[in-house]
Each structure stands twice: as structure tokens, then as C-alpha cells.
Amino acid sequence: PTLQFRDRADLFFAGQITGTEGYVGSAMGGLVAGINCTRLLDGKAPLTLPPTCMSGALLHYITHAEPKDFQPMKANMGLLPEMAERIRSKVERYAAYAARARHDLHAYLQQVSFVPLAAD
């Protein structure tokens, strides 16, 4: 899920070649590949986003799908792990997915001491 080439940790992929489709997947892939390349150059471990956020779920899909059945994928709610409790209302369910994603991503970024660069 780091977008690194298996045989060369200093080579990163992004865009359609990774198996993502759509503008969101392409933008996310480029952003994650760029951040992870920078982290590698700084001697830090690459980010592995939690699968409970859409970016992490999409990266998890493209790295864990069966090669013989692989289909390119764009961001969609079906990629996210189910909630612990079933929520019947779509609006409430999607709000719960979003809240869980924000919480898990924030906790992960704090854990790895990720601080975005400030714009000058």
C-alpha cells in the first residue's frame, strides 16, 4: 500500500498503472507516491494509510486483490470495511464511515509523526 515497486524500494508508481481509476484515485496515488518518496529520502518509513479511509481502502484493494481476478477500481464505498454495527440509513451509515475514517487517519498520522509542510 506504499506504491513502491517490490524489487526496488526507491521506485514509486502512481496513476493508472497501479490499477486505480478516476480522478480521485489518480490524485491520491500521486500524492501518496510523492509523500512516500520524500519520506524515503528523509530516512522515514513510508505511509501505509488505514484501510478505513478511502485512500487506504483503495490502496489495500490494489495491493491485495487476486492477480487473476484483478479489475481496476475507483474509489467507492464498497471498498471500506463494514462498520461494527449495521446502520440502515444510508446518510447515517456514510456519516459513520466518514467519522471513522477521520478518526483513524488522524490517529495514524499522529502515530507516525506526519506533519504536512506549511505553505510559505
Question: Which residue ranges define each predicted feature?
Answer:
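Short, conserved micro-motifs enriched in small and acidic residues
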Residues: T20-M28
